[in-house]
Amino acid sequence: MELEFLYDLLQLPKEVAQPTEEELPRGGKKKYLSPNSKRNPKFEELQKVLMEWINTTLLPEHIVVRSLEEDMFDGLILHHLFQKLASLKLEVEEISLTSASQRHKLGVILEAVNQNLQVEEKQAKWSVETIFNKDLLATLHLLVALAKRFQPDLPLPDNVQVEVIHIESTKTGLKSDKQVEQLTECKSHKDQPLQDAFDELFKLAPEKVHAVQEAIVSFVNQKLERLGLSVQSLDTQFADGVILLLLIGQLEGFFLHLKEFYLTPSSPTEMLHNVTLALDLLKDEGLFSYPVNPEDIVNKDAKSTLRILYSLFQKHSLRAEGGGAHHATPN
């Protein structure tokens, strides 16, 4: 058995049953919520608020949800909830008794939900398979999205994050890793966004924004030159978190082990892990306190990306000039 495989298995919490290779065929994948995340009071509060919201919404239809994990999988409650929220009628069976009919019903419902939320199927954090297989994380992502769309004033606990353990069966055995997923936004960022120089900057003429972007691109490329990397687009090239982590490592003298991040992220979840790690590093160093949602970076939000890079530019550009010329905050 290889040492890397042993290392990976040691990272799996004892409360999570380790699947055997017989249970998980070659190439198969499973994921689990970490026990600590399940016991997190904010995670429990999120489920409670969502259940109360569903039960209140469906009270006239005498439908009661007792467990989001167990009661949502067959599409019955989701069918009634979405029809009520969206004020429309879906042409599906009221009660589906077989697995095939339940999956078909879920497919029709989720297609309508995704269309209403303007989310492409491949970008959605839920699917027919995950909902049908009682994936609590996927179910919560779906319900949070519906709540934000149809009842934005619902008092969801802010900044709910969970640690997810991924298990994959490879040719050398079982491999595991951990990722952090964001379920709800930072409340101060969502409800009371702080006004700073970048809020004002983006109200100015496009050429002003472009000038700031060019200055920061030049700074970034100068620092990444020794790695043989270059950046042309701030909006897109920082979305997966890789260049951001490498830049922070160069500027702050961090050494990041390859086990800590994804060098070639292949999914939004892996990109989110990288960006979350980068923001945590910046906060730990006292470089950044503005409440940025990691998902905004992954979704290529120009203002959020520029705000983060400017915090590095402001510190290290001044240091390089020995305190000479002063770089004013963009406004």
From Swiss-Prot:
Isomerase found in the keyword field: no
Record-linked Gene3D superfamilies: Calponin-like domain
Alphabetized GO MF terms: actin binding
Tissue note: Expressed strongly in spleen and testis, moderately in lung and weakly in brain and heart.
One Gene Ontology term, aspect cellular component: cytoplasm
Keywords: Acetylation, Actin-binding, Cell adhesion, Cell junction, Cell membrane, Cytoplasm, Cytoskeleton, Membrane, Repeat
Compartments, record wording: Cell junction, Focal adhesion; Cell membrane; Cytoplasm, Cytoskeleton
Subunit details: Interacts with ILK; the interaction promotes the establishment of cell polarity required for leukocyte migration. Interacts with ARHGEF6; the guanine nucleotide exchange factor activity of ARHGEF6 is essential for the PARVG-induced enhancement of cell spreading.
Protein name: Gamma-parvin
